[in-house]
Amino acid sequence: MKNVTDSFVSLGHWPSAGSFGFNTDILATNLINLSVVLGVLIFFGKGVLSDLLDNRKQRILNTIRNSEELREGAIEQLEKARARLRKVEIEADQFRVNGYSEIEREKLNLIDSTYKTLEQLENYKNETINFEQQKASNQVRQRVFQQALQGALGTLNSCLNSELHLRTISANIGILGAMKEITD
């Protein structure tokens, strides 16, 4: 390894005129070395660098294009979703309105049905009351009639004796005999 180091040191001491060698003076050779390195890099790296930049540019353009396509797709989906939302909102409003009107209609039908049922119950109640009143009146009449009949029979039985009975029978026989003579 010492030989390698010595060879580099001896290269630095060669005379610069008429031969190739390394100048180790940093201040004197830095710009030249840099320009040589840059020239070599530009000459050989130009194609590689332009290929890298072109590839990077293509990837960026493809990414932008894909992003634009995705954005357009997202905008289309958003518009479709908004249209569906508007349609669903309209249908919901219609269902709400129809539901409210249906509820009102059912409410009115229920109220009408309840009034009719109450009216029928009132009629049944009145008919039942009238029937019970007639039944009570008939029972009272029957009792009055039975009591009057029993009173009349009691009066007749107490007033009728056999002599009155015989006179009534002979008067009736006389009336029947007179009727027979008139008809003959």
From Swiss-Prot:
Q: What does this protein do?
A: F(1)F(0) ATP synthase produces ATP from ADP in the presence of a proton or sodium gradient. F-type ATPases consist of two structural domains, F(1) containing the extramembraneous catalytic core and F(0) containing the membrane proton channel, linked together by a central stalk and a peripheral stalk. During catalysis, ATP synthesis in the catalytic domain of F(1) is coupled via a rotary mechanism of the central stalk subunits to proton translocation.
Recorded hits in InterPro entries, A to Z, give: ATP_synth_b/b'su_bac/chlpt
Sorted keywords for this record are: ATP synthesis, CF(0), Chloroplast, Hydrogen ion transport, Ion transport, Membrane, Plastid, Thylakoid, Transmembrane, Transmembrane helix, Transport
Keyword Protein transport set for record: no
The species is Lactuca sativa
- Give membrane topology per the record: Single-pass membrane protein
Q: Its encoding gene is what? A: atpF
Name the family the entry cites: Belongs to the ATPase B chain family.
Quote the Pfam families the UniProt record gives.
Answer: ATP-synt_B
| Highest taxon listed in the record's lineage | Eukaryota
Q: What is this protein called?
A: ATP synthase subunit b, chloroplastic
Protein's UniProt keywords contain Membrane: yes
As a miscellaneous remark, the entry gives: In plastids the F-type ATPase is also known as CF(1)CF(0).
Its subcellular locations are: Plastid, Chloroplast thylakoid membrane
Residues passing through the membrane, by range = 27-49
